[in-house]
Amino acid sequence: MARRAFLLGGTGQTGRALIPRLRGRGWEVVVGSRGEHELPPGVDHVQVDRADTAALEQALGNGTDVLVDFVAFEPEHAEQLLELKELIGSLVVISTASVYTDRDGRTFEEAKTPEQFPRFPVPINERGQPTVEPGDANYSTKKAAIEQVLLGQDALPATLIRAGAIYGPGGSVREWYFVKRILDERPYVILGDRGRSRFHPVSTENLAELIWLSAEHPGKRVLNAGDPGPPTLLDISRAIAAALGHDWTEVLLSTPGEPCETPWSCPRPVVLDMTEAAFEVGYRPVTTYERAVRATCEWLVEATKARPWEELMPRMAEYLQDAFDYETEDEFLRALITAD
């Protein structure tokens, strides 16, 4: 009899990468989400609001071998899953690498200056690195609270996946920072700290691989999720330019800061240790950033032909609201040339 996977909030970019992996290995897949979505043939869809526990219980029917939760944002969501433990064989819940804090208590969310940014070891290991205090102060503390609930119980095997900067077709992705510049035919790109900044990305393909392996091998644990050979900011800009066949002049500044702040810019490296994932579930990456980013770039080009990018990616629009001030960039570059 086929095993059953219930993907809660599974219509997004990672869910869509996960579905063929599960289906190809004989899993029956059911996707639960609030809206109506077109899914691949053979995949059942249940319209359900995860805030309604009774409705979620009904959606689970006779139960599921694994529930993958893409939309756990509050500790109450973890408690809700435990309420339904009789219907769930195991859990895989998407968390975030932003729960990590350094030994001095510095966090991602609270860092307003370079000096306040966490000083992490390279790489960051799940077992030894402290995390933020669980609470409701922000996204990271809420994720930490979810982890606390699920790791503090023995009713259900629960894998918490601390993902890096997720990218893939169909999502609100950081790659738009460079893709838009290419579409606007910018002749140069300005990068601070000579493009050495490193903020670990993870493709939806690699993340989906880790999720299905965690479903295959249930357990109570935390696993990092990041691409192999985490690229620098310069590597990322070059990979995206290569994917879209664009040539530009790289202006590599020795210091970080405006006007060259990007979604990956950070004063100290954030690199995730993937040893635990390999040891616990036999994880091996299926792609690299250079290979995987091409599909993301192609999707961005096509998707933004039909809709304004601000509508397509509202969260990224808020984050990048001042990122495409080309007039300021041009003035900065002219001043730089004059100074030389």
Feature map (PLM): residue ranges:
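Conserved beta-loop-beta element that borders a ligand/cofactor-binding pocket
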Residues: 144-169
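NAD(P)H-binding glycine-rich loop region in Rossmannoid oxidoreductase-like domains
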Residues: 35-93, 99-102
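Substrate-positioning beta->alpha
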Residues: 173-178, 191-213
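Glycine-rich Rossmann NAD(P)(H)-binding loop
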Residues: 8, 168, 191-197, 223-231, ...
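Mid/C-terminal beta-alpha module of Rossmann-like enzyme folds, strongest
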Residues: 210-269, 274, 294-295, 307-340
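A short C-terminal helix-loop "cap" of Rossmann-like NAD(P)-dependent dehydrogenase/epimerase domains
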Residues: 179-192, 245-251
